[in-house]
Design a protein with these regions (language model features):
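Noncatalytic alpha-helical scaffold of FAD-dependent oxidoreductases
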Residues: 1-301
Length: 301
């Protein structure tokens, strides 16, 4: 079956962000972005200023083709400092462009320090020092778009079988980002889990998906934790997740659903007001529940 915004539009909206509950997408037409050699610009600022600066730069500087943010993660200086990185096309574009490589001279060192952050607060401070001050000073940072997008997952692999990694992703309106930062400061440092990284990105308004993460433009915070692979570690993470979701939904935000079934059902319904119509459509198109998963059983059944 062919689906698009103009053909079988309802199913398209349900399948895009439908978590596999409305079928299997076997072929996809997507628009490609040309590969370019890019030059970075690094700007440090208080986290409270980040959202306004980030959105204003993206909205007004049309030369910016990629942008992201980071924040400090040590417990003593948690979310006390922010870094905005923007990329613009280099003036001279070589032909052909360089082959895809790792993302810079310090990538290997930063990967080692990334995993060393578990149980070692000094490594968190060292990583932030390299990423926010030393790296921008001693490396040119020029890279192709493809290289920036091709960071191997193996670089972040967890090798300690006593622990497991978990991602959280939250979406908040830029004008509420300061409140989100306060919520994270209140909750995350008290957790038993190790907080390893946060990457901030801009998400444009997208009202197409039935369960949209961005019915208005938002800032996404992708957060990486390392937790103990024990019942106590799992309970602690569940409590941390519920507390964060409570604060995020209180400011009109949402969270990405399928990382772990730690959210309460009422929290899912608050973050996604269209849940009832989503479930009704599921029962209409798939009454026998041919496509079913644990998330359906936990939140929608």
């Amino acid at each position: 079956m062919q689906c698009s915004r103009s053909e079988n539009a309802e199913l398209f909206a349900l399948a895009m962000g439908g978590y596999g509950l409305f079928g299997i997408i076997v072929e996809l037409d997507v628009e490609m972005t040309p590969n370019q050699l890019l030059e970075p610009k690094f700007e440090r600022m208080p986290p409270e200023r980040f959202a306004d600066r980030f959105v204003r730069t993206i909205d007004t500087d049309h030369a910016v083709t990629m942008a992201y943010g980071r924040m400090s993660v040590s417990r003593k200086k948690f979310f006390d400092d922010a870094l905005m990185v923007t990329y613009r096309p280099a003036a001279n574009q070589p032909a052909p462009l360089p082959a895809v490589t790792s993302s810079g001279k310090l990538t290997g060192l930063l990967d080692d320090i990334y995993r060393a952050q578990t149980g070692w607060e000094a490594a968190k401070g060292l990583r932030w020092l390299i990423e926010s001050r030393i790296g921008p000073t001693i490396t040119g940072g020029r890279a192709t778009r493809n290289s920036l997008m091709a960071e191997p997952v193996i670089n972040l692999a967890q090798t300690d079988m006593r622990r497991t990694d978990i991602l959280h992703e939250y979406f908040v309106a830029p004008e509420r980002f300061g409140e989100f930062v306060v919520a994270c400061r209140d909750i995350i440092p008290k957790s038993r889990a190790e907080f390893l990284n946060v990457t901030l990105r801009y998400v444009a308004e997208d009202k197409t998906p039935a369960l949209s993460i961005a019915p208005v433009h938002r800032i996404a915070a992708v957060m990486s934790f390392s937790q103990e692979a024990t019942p106590e570690g799992e309970i602690d993470m569940m409590q941390t997740t519920e507390a964060l979701i409570e604060r995020v939904t209180a400011i009109g935000g949402a969270f990405y659903l399928p990382y772990r079934l730690h959210a309460r059902r009422d929290q899912v319904e608050k973050a996604y007001p269209a849940v009832a119509s989503f479930v009704a459509a599921k029962r209409h198109y798939d009454p026998d529940l041919l496509f079913r998963n644990a998330m359906w059983d936990a939140y929608f059944a």
